[in-house]
Swiss-Prot record:
Integrin alpha-6/beta-1 (ITGA6:ITGB1) is a receptor for laminin on platelets. Integrin alpha-6/beta-1 (ITGA6:ITGB1) is present in oocytes and is involved in sperm-egg fusion. Integrin alpha-6/beta-4 (ITGA6:ITGB4) is a receptor for laminin in epithelial cells and it plays a critical structural role in the hemidesmosome. ITGA6:ITGB4 binds to NRG1 (via EGF domain) and this binding is essential for NRG1-ERBB signaling. ITGA6:ITGB4 binds to IGF1 and this binding is essential for IGF1 signaling. ITGA6:ITGB4 binds to IGF2 and this binding is essential for IGF2 signaling. Its main location: membrane. The lineage of its organism: Eukaryota, Metazoa, Chordata, Craniata, Vertebrata. Residues 1-23 form the signal peptide. It is found in: Cell membrane. It is a single-pass type I membrane protein; Lipid-anchor. This is Integrin alpha-6. Residues 24-1050 are extracellular. Disulfide bonds join C86-C94, C131-C154, C175-C188, C528-C535, C541-C601, C665-C671, C765-C776, C920-C967, C973-C978. The gene is ITGA6. Integrin alpha-6/beta-4 is predominantly expressed by epithelia. Isoforms containing segment X1 are ubiquitously expressed. Isoforms containing segment X1X2 are expressed in heart, kidney, placenta, colon, duodenum, myoblasts and myotubes, and in a limited number of cell lines; they are always coexpressed with the ubiquitous isoform containing segment X1. In some tissues (e.g. Ca(2+) 3 binds at D480, D482, N484, Y486, D488. GO terms for cellular component: cell surface; external side of plasma membrane; focal adhesion; integrin alpha6-beta1 complex; integrin complex; plasma membrane.
Amino acid sequence: MAAAGQLCLLYLSAGLLSRLGAAFNLDTREDNVIRKYGDPGSLFGFSLAMHWQLQPEDKRLLLVGAPRAEALPLQRANRTGGLYSCDITARGPCTRIEFDNDADPTSESKEDQWMGVTVQSQGPGGKVVTCAHRYEKRQHVNTKQESRDIFGRCYVLSQNLRIEDDMDGGDWSFCDGRLRGHEKFGSCQQGVAATFTKDFHYIVFGAPGTYNWKGIVRVEQKNNTFFDMNIFEDGPYEVGGETEHDESLVPVPANSYLGLLFLTSVSYTDPDQFVYKTRPPREQPDTFPDVMMNSYLGFSLDSGKGIVSKDEITFVSGAPRANHSGAVVLLKRDMKSAHLLPEHIFDGEGLASSFGYDVAVVDLNKDGWQDIVIGAPQYFDRDGEVGGAVYVYMNQQGRWNNVKPIRLNGTKDSMFGIAVKNIGDINQDGYPDIAVGAPYDDLGKVFIYHGSANGINTKPTQVLKGISPYFGYSIAGNMDLDRNSYPDVAVGSLSDSVTIFRSRPVINIQKTITVTPNRIDLRQKTACGAPSGICLQVKSCFEYTANPAGYNPSISIVGTLEAEKERRKSGLSSRVQFRNQGSEPKYTQELTLKRQKQKVCMEETLWLQDNIRDKLRPIPITASVEIQEPSSRRRVNSLPEVLPILNSDEPKTAHIDVHFLKEGCGDDNVCNSNLKLEYKFCTREGNQDKFSYLPIQKGVPELVLKDQKDIALEITVTNSPSNPRNPTKDGDDAHEAKLIATFPDTLTYSAYRELRAFPEKQLSCVANQNGSQADCELGNPFKRNSNVTFYLVLSTTEVTFDTPDLDINLKLETTSNQDNLAPITAKAKVVIELLLSVSGVAKPSQVYFGGTVVGEQAMKSEDEVGSLIEYEFRVINLGKPLTNLGTATLNIQWPKEISNGKWLLYLVKVESKGLEKVTCEPQKEINSLNLTESHNSRKKREITEKQIDDNRKFSLFAERKYQTLNCSVNVNCVNIRCPLRGLDSKASLILRSRLWNSTFLEEYSKLNYLDILMRAFIDVTAAAENIRLPNAGTQVRVTVFPSKTVAQYSGVPWWIILVAILAGILMLALLVFILWKCGFFKRSRYDDSVPRYHAVRIRKEEREIKDEKYIDNLEKKQWITKWNENESYS
């Protein structure tokens, strides 16, 4: 049981030490931080309490528990733990408080008793309680019957940390003498938590090990005044009853660690006297669930009036393992029956979150009702990376049933909420504050949260950071240790160190600023020394207030006057300067504020520069102040003086704008403008300044989301009289006219473009840091009858498929009078146009049918069905991938059968290219007859042509018959859905099918041909409703012809043959006659006068060669008209 007791306290242990974070009034400067160190391994700083001793001297101390400190000489042990007293000084160690310096080894053991596991002070001049929850009582030591019981016990010390009266000492061990064993009180572990009530009347103990670690809480009177007044009948009170010891009376589930609640009067003499028992749940007016075993009731404690009733005290106890998530129980006394009744139970929301590990009662909004703060350091949220939580329950005038807590979250694995403490009003704003420890956040952190009229400020005002591990395991506060009227904060750790942070007084410095003259008239110049002849007298005054009212130190400050700070930051030159201060318009002066509400002023002359161009915008002047630290600080009570700090909630500067004298405001010197605004959404072509209006659908502009990076909003602003017949009514110059455009998260300001350049209008647009808002100055003034058109260029990179529309808030502002300047919302609808297209082709596109009819039951392979047709559908995506949008599906209207139920096309197989494995639905439509697939390529005609005796005759003059088959008329179609998962840029689906030959032989053999139409289209399944799919469908046509053998040639009638022969003979005779008449058959003869031949006579001898040479003198040739056969020419 010893091990269990140790785990009871240490399973959330971790961490120590200190340092600064987001600074407010806890002084984190190293010179002002007080650090105290204990012996290594002693767990010095495990528990803390601030104590105010009034006698024998006024002293303020920090009490530090070190439950692993070495034993005192007479304790007969090695480590027993102890309690230390630390003076509030910069140097000097802490002193161990000597008590419990004895031991009886025959009846007790103090080894590892963990004295100092908790420590609490009763308040100024009050008692101190500290406990050792692992203290053991022994019986039959050194025998076989030896037994050990971890009862635990507590010591009460007087204000001077000594044992002086009967109430002091270590007899506070109510479990001793009761039934032993862990089922009852043998592992009581009294003292895991102990506290005093705020009215100093009671002392409260938690014993989470009672009843199988179900836990109890005990309350006893602790007030001498009541004892002296003979008021005895006030307890003790105990959950479960002091005499009954009935664990069923504990109002929380077992294993909750609630501790038995026991209240007893200090003055009782009979231990069975004045006991108030808790009634069984079935007898209680309001039934509450029982707490389970191992719930640890009593693990944390606090109390107060104004929790349920303003007059009755309520005890608050945590049970961090109740119901496996934790619970916190509110308990009250029933004075009539002397019972303790549960008033309310808060349940933890996270499994194993340790809800109730620490509790604090504090009135955060000062409404007179105490609020409850609960730590759950092991709460986690996987999605939000949360590691620990603190729940703040704001009291609704004593009613808790419908209170929804405010949850403060810590970072992952930080154990945020292991310590929660009411630290008092550290900034003296009238509202108490709390501190939350997170020892595993880096080296450990403590978060300071301020109270307010609205309750808790959920953003920490300061974060204290550790310089050694596990800083923030324990926290103490709500007491002024250094006597400056501000509560201080001490932070402990598990690395044997403690840090004290002193609170700095918070002061509010009121700043006023006046300028004379209050307007600049450029026509009135004086000899004041300024280059322009125009001077301004600037005066700023300061005074401070603080709490308490008696705090009146002399404070040195530095006042600063500065003009046109933002203008100079933007790179523009200033239009003014302070006299004798150079070109920078800034003037500083040291001042001393001697006491509260004493006003001190500074004054300087401001010169207007000569030849300034911007005469429309006002000249801003600011006054600010800083506290000046002295070169040497005096010491108070051996500590460095803590300087005051400015209130962070107060404005840092006072501001005034000096305007130029306005013109163009009419005879009454009042400017009544009439600004009007019109807008249109546009697209921008690339990076060019060319804009086109968006199309309008049902009165709303429609943005088609494609690849465009920018859109533009065309804005036109006019300032003209509303009634031309009464032009003096309005339409005056609009001074400081501006347009404020606020954009949704999906749009970001990029730039602005003016339609026409009008220098006198001085249009300029400036966006904030994240581009969510743009301020456009239209002119100062924006004159009468002016108009301007410009474009706000907006980036659409954040517009996604989940963006249904775009809302831009447009608001015109002017310092001139105009009441009708209501904001306008520019709306546009976002349409997602998916660049998906589908096309289809059939291979072959013409097929034949023929042969004989074969029944469905006789078919074993696909070849027996009919001609092969492969449909290929190609899907192309020219846009962005569909991964983040949804799933595209190809829908194919498959012509399965004709209207009488006979097969038309038989789908054999579906294949894909460029996609993940495609599974089309319904699967039963694919090869539903389980035919054997063919692995050979098809020829043009697979069906053997056979003669069919159907008595049909083929006529040359017969009319050609055809029919079109489609789903909407004469075909029963099945919708085949094929998800296109993994579609990137393009993909193909191939549907292998067979023409059902028998159906065509039976139904369509009399037709010359048929067309089969098949339609396919794409749809997208997505959460977005604004999706458009152009060109998302296609149609494929296949033409089917009967084979030639289906229609047999049966001969031509004889009379046609006879007529053809006679017609041919007649035509031949006619042709011969015509040719004869034309002399075609007459033989041609030559005329005698015409020579029949033309030749040259060359005698043979004339061709002879002499001496192998030709004869040079050849004779002239003669023409011959007659041949002489006897002469030789060859």
